[in-house]
Amino acid sequence: MAGDRAVQHNLEAAWPADLPAGDERRLLAAGRALLRADATGAGRAKWPSVFGDPHRALAPAFATARFRIQAAIARRDKSPDTAVVHLVWAGMDRGGTFTDLRVTDWFFTRTSKKGAATWTAQPRT
């Protein structure tokens, strides 16, 4: 979508890249998966520390067929070991209202285990 490219361009222009490319790719993939799980319910079981018990989860608010991520960036947050994935998305809720330019931020912390760094999503508070 042409409008989505403009949103992506504006995000990148407003918030210059400050993470290594590999970290940015991993964070973007995780952020997109988290947003899809949060909005549609699909894949929540993969994130128990974020969504809790999948058997007690709330019904998803958005239909998977009417959900799309318009733009996304991953950037450092307050320290080198924290990051935020900023996502702009569109979706139709269960009531049939379609809205675009919704904004969601997911926060991550970096930990090292056996010399390998991993990014862990933080639950919302």
List the model feature ranges, each with a label.
Residues 39-125:
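Structured, amphipathic secondary-structure segments that form assembly/contact surfaces
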Residues 1-65:
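Core segments of small alpha/beta cavity-forming domains
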